[in-house]
Amino acid sequence: MKNLSKTEIAVMTGKTIFQNRIKQADRAAMGKSELLIKKSTNVKLGKRVTKGKWKGFPIFTLTLEERATCPRSCAHWADCYGNNMMYAFRYQAGPELEAMLETELAELQRKHPNGFLVRLHILGDFYSVGYVAKWAKWLGMFPALHVYGYTANQPDAADATERSIGQALLSLSDNCGSRWAVRFSGNFNRATMTANSADDSRAMAAVTAKQAFICPTQISKVTGKYAAKGEETLVPDCGACGLCWTASKPVVFITH
């Protein structure tokens, strides 16, 4: 009898492969200076926005547990890039996380009153309507807060829980202006604020028709094609691009 692999078990149970990299949002379980919302050290994201109306904003990130907080309908449920992120800490969803996030956002508001940008989520997704409502509340509480990211929760999902989360996110997008730029991943029913994979022919057809754009951080500055590792790209990072939070057209990502 064949034993299931760690990946197969994680996919089946809806958890991360790396259970030893999950942390509770609890001061006793975290390092003395450890924060949930971390300064970006990701070369693909950049450390701050260097172009456009948000120029100068420092970039921060939040990482939750993949699959445990995601809808099962996600196209990358099985091949999530979190499968290769064995060093990333994932924070457990729930009231403790939300309480600590509010405290940290208050401090970021104090430190960066002119604006800061939070990328949601490096791993994981919006796990409840209540959690979405908290972000709506925080946008009201902290005027310097700006958010961008992606969600697999669809407003027209067949699953009622996913649909309610997706509709809450859509409502937030419709009512919060440019400060909330969360795109719906794998959605071909909407003409704006989506993020799709180049593996899908519909995405590339939209690019050809100039109804979508390929992420400039993935395109070689020399060849105009997908950039090889180490090759200079059209823009070096998200902070130097800004299209995901300034453009409404769908963005297309090349799977890597």
Predicted features, each with a name:
Residues M1-H256:
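Class I S-adenosyl-L-methionine
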